[in-house]
């Protein structure tokens, strides 16, 4: 699982890298933006696909065409970030997420990453069929169920 911890400025390629992570946690005070057009560039690391998938096509166009900055709070409100938190709490928030994740099945994470990848590349009907038909090996299920009391 990859986590982007965003503080300060996150523009252009940095924004593309953050969106490629599984979870984005951003400081409220962070400044983000797609500034490709400002500098005569084009996205090459997935922004043209990920940004509209996260925030919607209309907002993605507006952000890309204006190259305007937006806050961490806005990023979370729009779905680009999973969590926005005050800068003073950013490290603790990320650490808390890591601790929660560490308690869960790593084998489940492998399955989720594969299935979420399918969600990005297949239509819903094909993605649902893939989920139903794909087997994943879990060696910790019995132990985890026994410990669930």
Listing of model-derived features with the role each one plays in the protein:
Residues 67-73, 88, 92, 96-149:
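C-terminal alpha-helix plus adjacent terminal tail
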Residues 2-107:
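Crotonase-fold acyl-CoA enzyme core
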């Amino acid at each position: 699982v990859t986590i982007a911890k965003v503080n300060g400025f996150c523009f252009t390629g940095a924004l593309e890298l953050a969106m490629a992570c599984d979870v984005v946690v951003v400081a409220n005070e962070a400044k983000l933006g797609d500034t490709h057009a400002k500098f005569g560039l084009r996205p090459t690391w997935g922004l043209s696909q990920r940004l509209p998938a996260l925030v919607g096509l209309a907002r993605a166009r507006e952000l890309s065409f204006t190259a305007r900055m937006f806050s961490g709070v806005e990023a979370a409100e729009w779905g680009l970030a999973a969590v926005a938190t005050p800068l003073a709490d950013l490290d603790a928030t990320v650490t808390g997420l890591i601790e929660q994740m560490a308690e869960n099945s790593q084998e489940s994470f492998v399955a989720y990453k594969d299935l979420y990848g399918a969600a990005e590349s297949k239509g819903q009907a094909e993605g649902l069929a893939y989920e139903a038909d794909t087997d994943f090996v879990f060696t910790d299920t019995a132990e985890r169920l026994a410990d669930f009391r």
